[in-house]
Amino acid sequence: QADNPYMEVLFDKMQLRTFTYNFTFSPKNRQETEDVQKIIQLFRFHMSPELKGKNNRFLTLPSEFDIHYMYQAQDGQASENDYYNKIATCVCTGCDVNYTPDGVKSFEGGAPTKITMSLAFQETELLTKERVAEGF
């Protein structure tokens, strides 16, 4: 019996990458509060499936998201930031909202003075060497 001089590694599987983004909203008036509510509702809507078919027996897939890191160039145009890795098409897997991050504080009428939102995304494709070479 001879010793094997080569290292062996058991490759099991790749994991899909996940990304989390945290936002803090501090609306100053009623219009800004309504805008924040629309943003939250938009993400909650697009992360959810839809019932379809006769007797609502089937679920459709949730919306997909293409996330890009952008910056404003000196000429005022938005440009993609190449210093960050690209992100493949994602689905939103979580939308956590806290309406009382600093305790219960509200404007007249009950609207919260501060809201935090955490969004979780997961890519829909596995990362390969070819995709890494493309900047992912």
Q: Which sequence ranges carry the predicted segments?
A:
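Acidic, Ser/Thr- and Gly-enriched intrinsically disordered low-complexity segments
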Residues: 1-136
